[in-house]
Amino acid sequence: LTFEDGRKLTCTEDHPVLTSDNTWVKVKDLELNATKIKTSITCPLVDVNEEIKECSDWKLQVGNILLQTNTHEEYMKTLAFARIIGLLITDGHMNVKDKIASLFLGHMIDVYSILEDIKMFCESQQTNFVIKNLFIVRIPAKLTNQIIQLPGLLSGRKVNQTGMLPEFILDEKCPRPIIREFLGGMFGGDGHTCVLGMHRGKRDLLSSVSFSQTKTYEHRESLQSMFEDIQKLLAKCGIHSTTIQKPKETSFSKNKYQLQDKNDASNRSFQLTLHLPMEQLIPFSEKIGFRYCCHKSQRLEAGVSYRRLREEVCRQHNWLVNRVDEITHFKEIKSKNPDKTVPTKSAIIKAVEELKKTEGLLHDYAIPSTHDITDHLIKGTEFGKFTSKSFPTAEQFMEKIGALNWFLSDDNQPKKIDHMNEEVLEKTEEKEENELSAGYGVHRGSNALPTMNLEVVSRINVGPKHVYDISVEETHSFLANGIVAHNCMVSHGAARFTRERLYDVSDKFQVHVCSKCGMVAAYNDALGIHCCKMCDNRTDFAYVEIPYSCKLLFQELQTMNVVPRIMTE
């Protein structure tokens, strides 16, 4: 299946998909260019084992915590730590003297995500997270006491201190996956997602991703240096051509010091912004993304959808032009005889039919005219300005797929509070200036993510394929069994969600497995006694986490002389 934004889905013909009217329809019964399918955030798929190899035994000592990347569990724990630190230095507050650290979030979904990561290190006893327009997660003291020992973190108010990044992330040996998670946390905090801007009375300007921070006048140079370091980190993750905007005084600072001498900038705050070009929007979504901010992720998905449509239409247009040239030898004939007329109408029709048989035509705007063919093949002009009224603007596209409210809705619900410390107040005011005035992508009272509705423009038989989505190497998402299911990058939360549903809430259980024969061993952790009754092994065991039902199933099978074994590396 090819959807109207260019994304593709490979499935069996009797695979059920959820339509925009909340009914399940088999793929073979879909009405092309009419039926709309529900879809949501589609995250890239990564090979965890390959990334562990890429990290090549990297490790970091943080207080009493040793972060490593040798095993899957250690690797996931290290990624979680990088995400937490990325958010802490942007939308967080740390006080070394009081030994406290807090994280500021915009939605309860994000709170659950951060708690899952914190749980890898220690349990959190916090139950109330709401304060004014924010959700606050207080990092447990056990973890905070280790974090404050990390070099390069600022304690107290960050706005009037030198801008810097943690030392471990600036180390040339720091692996790309860890940098990716750190940047994801940073952009989840002080990053800015796609925005629909006004242009000539219409909301048709779609902005790209950016990142900003504020410092007082005397610390502007350090902030500039910090942003240059961020540019280098982005480049390591494959994001290039970023630009840093000149410092600009914040409106909050202007209002606060409006009666002060304008020549005295000592106490004024200036914001520095790093911009990603629109060409890097899709690469940013695929290679980094936002962590701990469902609102930004949701808008990014819609922005990527529109950007993908434009890029795919350009690609199809150029393919059609080149195919017409192959059929008619247009360029060759014109180079020999510029005045000769070369018929192209039938060739264009033939090329379009060929395209429809292979992948489907996304939009009629991709079909070239004879004038387009002349411009591209003879004059060398490029396609992609999208000035025609027949091609949808960003606002029209968002409205069509049901994502416009993600950019327009005003979902501010101030909460009544009795007291707030200075740091929380400062963060709240900063939030109100930068974020809360805009529409929120996910309704704050919702416990689920919204979906987009995309038309199916093409359905093509691709022959035998693996029926299990997990065996497909390409990026896919699909709808099944009444829920939205995805192949997601572990860092975007899918792996943690799967672990929660299949292990944490399913009577989680731990066993010690004999590394020699794979049988579950008898053990006493308190006394450190382990014994395999099958091979009398007493020294070589592996710790394995499985659902209790799985352990019970193994024991039932053993009573029937069927012996399941858990072989570990």
What are these regions (language model features)?
Residues 1-487:
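Internal intein/HINT superfamily modules and their associated LAGLIDADG
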